[in-house]
């Protein structure tokens, strides 16, 4: 979902939409359901969206985009012009970024030119926030996941040399003499961030053609590469599919990958006049803001609090959180249980229990930290972690850790709620101050995290008089399937 300000060419907005749809209709193999139209939703702050012109039953095909139309490394002529296996050399993220930079610089000569014109050119994703704006997120760990400096290093190390070597394929924009100048570096970083943000917000993992009927999943990584990312599937920009706005509650469509095409289908009946929504999945508003540049209340149920290993160890009285100098951490690490952080979700059930929300790995860590020396020796000799039981001692450590986490935020939940109540709604259209919009989104994110924190603290107080027992979840064997992964 994009705000009005993300599409600066207000006068050409509808013409760009019309040209895009004409381009799709004229493209071989594209099938568009006549019941759909690409709508101007700027009046409600949603940019473009796809709307049903008449009733659509569940299971009906909405549109089909041939694989050859998807903007991928495989489909771009750049791969042939460079004569290199870009995905193998650069990984799926940077190779697609390079291809998109190439196609973007081709302008009208690019086969995807009408597609580029309907994509946003401005973003509210955290990659584009100023340091002062990021401070509004306070102690949210989402700030640590932005990775701006790493992204820029990747652009300079992997993409800049190719542009400098082949100016015939990557002509500098008007007014720019060379990519190798300071101005050229700044221009490349800017266009790289734009393309990287488009990939992060809109690209899909593209399965091999023979893997029929797999659902397309919008990727959720930042656009830096590491060893794991290079093993991921190729990325692709799917025209029209990525123009669907997302809504956790009103999701009514899903992308399916078939042998020759990517097909969007209705997963429930869609009434005339209703917007067609994709879904990003169960992601917290902090990640919604990082990846897509907006927040909505209906994703608040997925808000989480992240508790770092460092904070837990400090609450337990350890000098540091280094497994090499902390035998108990080293022991858990050897069992593949230790994490660098633990995600605590928002309790959403009518009668939530600690067992439902506390990660088993976190409880095992707390139980290990409270073992007596003799008990710890026995565990080491058996090469078996303690059962995930949250007794009074473990609860006390967790409460201290949460209180320390609470103190990391610059303001209290009460003051944030009071501030939110005092703010008047921003207009959906017109000139909306960018900074004011971002401050409000940051406020929503930190309120969600503080609500989770306060709720869990309230649940822990009665637990200090007893203990929480839970199933061992196979901790004597392979625990990797239940590990809490940080994204």
Predicted regions and their residues:
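Long, positively charged leader/targeting segments at protein N-termini
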Residues: 2-69, 74-77, 117-487
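Eukaryotic helix-linker segments that join adjacent hydrophobic helices
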Residues: 69-71, 76-129
């Amino acid at each position: 979902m994009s705000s009005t300000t993300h599409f600066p060419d207000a006068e050409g907005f509808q013409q760009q939409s019309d040209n895009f749809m004409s381009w799709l209709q004229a493209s071989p193999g594209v099938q568009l359901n006549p019941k759909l139209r690409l709508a101007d939703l700027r009046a409600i702050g949603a940019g473009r969206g796809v709307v049903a012109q008449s009733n659509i039953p569940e299971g009906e095909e909405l549109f089909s985009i041939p694989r050859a139309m998807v903007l991928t490394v495989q489909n771009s002529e750049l791969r042939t012009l460079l004569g290199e296996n870009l995905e193998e050399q650069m990984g799926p993220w940077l190779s697609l970024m390079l291809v998109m930079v190439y196609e973007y610089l081709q302008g009208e000569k690019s086969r995807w030119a009408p597609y580029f014109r309907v994509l946003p050119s401005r973003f509210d994703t955290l990659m584009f926030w100023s340091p002062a704006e990021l401070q509004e997120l306070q102690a949210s760990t989402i700030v640590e996941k932005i990775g701006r400096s790493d992204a820029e290093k990747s652009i300079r190390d992997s993409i800049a040399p190719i542009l400098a070597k082949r100016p015939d394929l990557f002509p500098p924009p008007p007014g720019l003499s060379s990519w190798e100048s300071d101005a050229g570096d700044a221009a490349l970083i800017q266009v790289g961030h734009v393309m990287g943000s488009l990939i992060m917000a809109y690209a899909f993992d593209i399965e091999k053609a023979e893997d029929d009927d797999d659902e397309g999943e919008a990727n959720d990584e930042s656009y830096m590469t590491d060893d794991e990312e290079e093993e991921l599937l190729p990325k692709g920009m799917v025209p029209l599919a990525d123009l669907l706005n997302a809504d956790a509650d009103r999701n009514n469509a899903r992308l399916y990958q078939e042998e020759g095409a990517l097909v969007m289908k209705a997963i429930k009946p869609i009434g005339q006049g209703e917007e067609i929504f994709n879904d990003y999945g169960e992601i917290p508003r902090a990640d919604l803001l990082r990846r897509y540049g907006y927040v909505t209340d209906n994703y608040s149920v997925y808000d989480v609090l992240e508790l770092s290993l460092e904070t837990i160890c400090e609450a337990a009285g350890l000098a540091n959180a280094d497994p090499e100098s902390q035998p108990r951490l080293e022991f858990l690490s050897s069992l593949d249980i230790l994490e660098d952080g633990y995600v605590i979700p928002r309790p959403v059930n009518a009668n939530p229990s600690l067992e439902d929300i506390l990660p088993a790995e976190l409880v095992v860590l707390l139980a290990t930290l409270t073992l007596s020396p003799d008990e710890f020796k026995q565990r080491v000799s058996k090469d078996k972690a303690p059962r995930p039981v949250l007794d009074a001692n473990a609860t006390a450590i967790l409460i201290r850790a949460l209180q320390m986490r609470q103190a990391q935020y610059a303001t209290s939940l009460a003051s944030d709620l009071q501030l939110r109540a005092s703010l008047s709604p921003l207009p959906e259209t017109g000139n909306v101050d960018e900074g004011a919009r971002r401050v409000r989104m940051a406020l929503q994110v930190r309120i969600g995290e503080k609500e989770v924190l306060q709720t869990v603290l309230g649940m822990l107080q009665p637990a200090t008089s007893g203990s929480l027992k839970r199933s061992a979840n196979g901790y004597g064997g392979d625990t990797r399937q239940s590990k809490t992964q940080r994204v």
